[in-house]
């Protein structure tokens, strides 16, 4: 899961995972 932040999406491009 990724943190609930704008621009953060589940996937290889999620910087807050």
Swiss-Prot record:
Q: Report whether Ribosomal protein shows up as a keyword of the record.
A: no
Q: Name one GO cellular component term.
A: extracellular region
Q: Which UniProt keywords apply?
A: Disulfide bond, Secreted, Toxin
Q: In which tissues is it expressed?
A: Expressed by the venom duct.
Disulfide partners: 2-16, 3-14, 8-17
Q: Which domain of life is it from?
A: Eukaryota
Q: According to its UniProt record, where is this protein located?
A: Secreted
Q: Does the keyword Disulfide bond apply?
A: yes
Q: Which GO terms describe its molecular function?
A: toxin activity
What domain comment accompanies this record?
The cysteine framework is III (CC-C-C-CC).
Q: Which family does it belong to?
A: Belongs to the conotoxin M superfamily.
By what name is this protein known? Conotoxin Reg12h
Q: Which organism is it from?
A: Conus regius
Upper taxonomic classification of the species? Answer: Eukaryota, Metazoa, Spiralia, Lophotrochozoa, Mollusca
């Amino acid at each position: 899961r990724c943190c609930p932040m704008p621009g953060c999406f589940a996937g290889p491009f999620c910087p807050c995972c």
